From Swiss-Prot:
Any one GO molecular-function label of the UniProt entry: structural constituent of ribosome
Keyword Ribosomal protein in annotation: yes
Segments traversing the membrane: none
Taxonomy of the source species: Bacteria, Bacillati, Bacillota, Bacilli, Lactobacillales
GO biological processes: translation
Pfam family, one: Ribosomal_L33
Protein name in UniProt: Large ribosomal subunit protein bL33A
Protein family according to the UniProt entry: Belongs to the bacterial ribosomal protein bL33 family.
A GO cellular component annotation in the UniProt record: ribosome
Alphabetically ordered keywords of this record: Ribonucleoprotein, Ribosomal protein
Gene field: rpmG1
UniProt source species: Streptococcus pneumoniae (strain ATCC BAA-255 / R6)
């Protein structure tokens, strides 16, 4: 089952991206390096619901 998740910047706590994942095949939380427009640099984004 695919669920919608938000990706939140780890340094400034702004929610920048919306994505989905399959919770059966990937039960752990997602950690992705993405661009943060507020900080204007690439930062670590963590899964939040």
């Amino acid at each position: 089952m695919r669920v919608k998740i938000n990706l939140k910047c780890s340094s400034c706590d702004s929610i920048n991206y919306l994505t989905s994942k399959n919770s059966k095949t990937h039960p752990d939380k997602i950690e992705v390096l993405k661009y943060c427009p507020k900080e204007r640099k690439v930062t670590l984004h963590l899964e939040s619901k």
